[in-house]
Design a protein with these regions (language model features):
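An N-terminally biased module of ancient metal coordination in phosphate/nucleic-acid-related enzymes
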Residues: 1-72
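Proteins with a high burden of low-complexity, intrinsically disordered sequence enriched in S/T/G/P/A and R
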Residues: 28-31, 37, 156-165
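Active-site gating/metal-coordination segments in enzymes
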Residues: 62-164
Length: 165
């Protein structure tokens, strides 16, 4: 079985990367996953994928003044949840934790998405959400503790390096 651990289907353009053209929907992702890809000369497909929203669409500032933290979380996770529900045989939910939506809101959402929706992993995108995990322990420690309690792994991205830096 081949499992991709980082896919970002969406029904809207990623707000951070300003991609042009059509959004990378669940149908496009499934088509990509179906391949075929040749491994040791044999045609294969990607059997399952951990999916989460594109990180640019999880930035809290785009809802400032319109929604509270929990509403913002549920909005940015909505398409991922829809995909997981529609194709549970192919997609595994990965919750994106953004402490800028409120630590309490985020920790409660981790538990809700794992227990109620069957999500199996949590991702922290410190670079997109503008914090350093080593300096924001009050933000990340409660989330790590909740993930440990629930037995779900955490993927943490701390920086994107560019050439010359």
């Amino acid at each position: 079985m081949i499992i991709d651990i980082s896919c970002y289907p969406t029904d809207q353009v990623d707000l951070a990367w300003c991609h042009e053209g059509e959004p990378y929907t669940m149908d496009r992702l499934l088509e990509t996953m179906d391949g075929p890809y040749f491994v040791n000369g044999k045609p294969r497909r990607i059997d399952k994928a951990f999916i989460q929203p594109p990180q640019g669409n999880t930035i809290y500032t785009w809802t400032d003044g319109d929604k509270d933290g929990r509403q913002s979380i549920d909005d940015y996770m909505a398409y991922t949840l829809k995909c997981v529900r529609k194709h549970p045989d192919r997609f595994i939910g990965c919750f994106v934790y953004n402490p800028r939506c409120g630590v309490k809101n985020g920790v409660e959402a981790i538990e809700r998405y794992v227990k109620e929706h069957g999500f199996k992993m949590v991702q922290m995108q410190a670079n997109m959400h503008a914090y350093r995990p080593d300096r924001a322990l009050d933000w990340v420690r409660p989330a790590f503790e909740k993930c440990a309690e629930l037995g779900v792994p955490v993927v943490t991205t701390v920086a994107v390096r560019k050439r010359g830096l």
